[in-house]
A protein has these predicted regions:
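Active-site-adjacent segment of SDR/Rossmann-fold oxidoreductases
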Residues: 87, 108-119
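Conserved amphipathic alpha-helix within the SDR
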Residues: 6-20
Length: 166
């Protein structure tokens, strides 16, 4: 549960103990809430929960794995973001803000760690046909990709190490 920071810390320790570190970290967890700001005045907890999962959980894993990556002078952190970050999708302010925070962190960190052999890639993932988008009927008319195509984008990121895939 990456929304639970203690759980993140336990995962990092387990990976270090059992595998000696992490070569590739793919942050793919996501919580999406479709609700306009005008309908969110009394729902601040939605923003907190979304940031906790989409940003702070991923950040906790990154901060946990980075020291060993630096020590080994290699590592690649791939953050699954959203095409919504590029389009500022209405009614998704909590989700887009959380993904934008991770995108901005990654862009800053990438320049700090490139000379240490650490790469960061942000994938601004299009809509993927998963249960997460199923309840939103308007997506039925939007172009989507399959989970297999999404996995191909992650494999391309691992192979080519670009800063961004749109």
């Amino acid at each position: 549960d990456i929304a639970d920071l203690a759980s993140c810390d336990a995962l990092v320790q387990r990976v270090h103990k059992e595998h000696g570190g992490c070569d590739f970290l793919v942050n793919n967890a996501g919580r999406s809430i479709r609700r306009g700001v005008i309908n969110s005045f009394d729902r601040f907890h939605d923003f907190e929960r979304t940031m906790q999962l989409n940003y702070f959980g991923a950040l906790r894993l990154i901060m946990g794995f980075l020291p060993k990556m630096i020590e080994r002078r290699r590592g690649h952190i791939i953050n699954i973001s959203s095409i919504g970050v590029l389009s500022n999708a209405p009614r998704f302010s909590a989700y887009v803000a959380s993904k934008s925070a991770l995108d901005s962190f990654s862009a800053c960190a990438a320049s700090e760690f490139l000379d240490k052999g650490i790469h960061f890639t942000t994938i601004n993932m299009p809509l993927v046909r998963t249960p997460m988008i199923a309840p939103t009927k308007m997506y039925d008319s939007f172009p989507t990709i399959s989970p297999e195509e999404a996995a191909d984008l992650v494999c391309e990121a691992i192979r080519a190490k670009p800063k961004q895939i749109n």
